[in-house]
């Protein structure tokens, strides 16, 4: 039902403003790419398997204890 409501809204938008629909499509394409990049940056390693905790541990080994305050 929720999905149907969303589609209904999209069709209303499309009838009002096609440019807005194009923008939404573009946004939906860009956001996952940005999230992948962000995960890659936070992970701190090229294979992207690290977590934020791993990154903190690596940072602590390199620089000393990080001060987040």
From Swiss-Prot:
| UniProt protein name | Putative uncharacterized protein YGR226C
Which cell locations does it reside in?
Membrane
Q: Does the keyword Transmembrane apply?
A: yes
Query: What is the protein's membrane topology class?
Result: Single-pass membrane protein
> In terms of one coarse class, where is the protein primarily found?
membrane
Q: What else is known?
A: Completely overlaps AMA1.
- Segments spanning the bilayer are 13-35
Q: Which organism is it from?
A: Saccharomyces cerevisiae (strain ATCC 204508 / S288c)
Which UniProt key words apply to this protein? Membrane, Transmembrane, Transmembrane helix
Q: GO CC terms for this protein? A: membrane
Taxonomic lineage per UniProt? Eukaryota, Fungi, Dikarya, Ascomycota, Saccharomycotina
